[in-house]
């Protein structure tokens, strides 16, 4: 069978968790970064500090890690910052843009910090995992790419996918599509879907009404 690898990263936890579970039955590897990764770090018993983490799904993530049999690839380092809750509440993007960044191993995330992008070692790990892939689905950015200093992971993944030789590369989701377009890579992908919700439903294995109707046409 041809290698199928997938990168999932998003704040839409419920749907993304379902996507990951569905992809584990089809993909050779599922690479998880962005906000979703911290729920899986927590599931491994790691400190995540103030990083976005959906506690209601930690136990579910533990189950996915157990059934994945090594298919799930998680970041090994992250770009973190320390910002006060008050500054974040007042102006999140402004606060993190001014904050000093620190690259830390995922096992050493400080309780007062939050991860906002994957680190350089993770970028190299993901690029290595993508080598030889024949089909790749990318959904969601690797970090807070709206702020330049936290866009390196997203840019690196986008560039790596755009330059994969002989691979079918599909972007599902508005943020990923926006990142690819902003980097001028929109013509380097096999297909870009800007319908984030519909893309996620399809990746969950659900039937899309429009597609179903088209399939029924004789």
Where are these regions (language model features)?
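A short, aliphatic-rich alpha-helical micro-motif
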Residues: 6, 24, 130-131
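Acidic, glycine-rich loop-and-beta core segments that form the ion-binding/anion-interacting portion
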Residues: 16-75, 81-82
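Charged helix-capping and loop-helix junction motifs
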Residues: 150-159
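C-terminal functional extensions of proteins
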Residues: 49, 54-63, 68, 79, ...
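Short, conserved loop/helix-junction motifs that constitute active-site signature segments
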Residues: 23-26, 159-167, 185-187
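Glycine-rich beta-strand-to-loop/alpha-helix junction loops that act as flexible
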Residues: 10-11, 32-35, 139-142, 170-175, ...
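Active-site rim loops that border cofactor/substrate pockets in soluble metabolic enzymes
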Residues: 70-135, 141-148
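Single conserved hydrophobic/aromatic residue that forms the stacking wall/gate
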Residues: 1-9, 13
């Amino acid at each position: 069978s041809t290698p199928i690898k997938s990168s999932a990263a998003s704040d839409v936890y419920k749907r993304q968790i379902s996507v990951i579970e569905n992809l584990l039955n089809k993909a050779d590897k599922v690479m998880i970064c962005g906000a979703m990764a911290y729920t899986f770090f927590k599931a491994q018993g790691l400190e995540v500090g103030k990083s976005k983490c959906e506690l209601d799904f930690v136990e579910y993530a533990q189950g996915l890690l157990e059934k994945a049999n090594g298919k799930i690839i998680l970041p090994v380092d992250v770009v973190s910052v320390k910002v006060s809750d008050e500054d974040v509440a007042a102006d999140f993007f402004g606060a993190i843009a001014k904050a000093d960044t620190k690259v830390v191993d995922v096992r050493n995330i400080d309780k007062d910090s939050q991860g906002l992008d994957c680190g350089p070692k993770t970028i190299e790990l993901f690029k290595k995992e993508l080598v030889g892939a024949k089909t790749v689905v990318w959904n969601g950015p690797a970090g807070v790419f709206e702020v330049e200093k936290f866009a390196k992971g997203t840019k690196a993944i986008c560039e790596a996918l755009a330059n994969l030789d002989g691979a079918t590369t599909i972007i599902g989701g508005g943020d990923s599509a926006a990142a690819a377009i902003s980097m001028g890579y929109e013509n380097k992908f096999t297909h870009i879907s800007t319908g984030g919700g519909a893309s996620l439903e399809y990746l969950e294995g659900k039937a899309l009404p429009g597609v179903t109707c088209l399939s029924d046409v004789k």
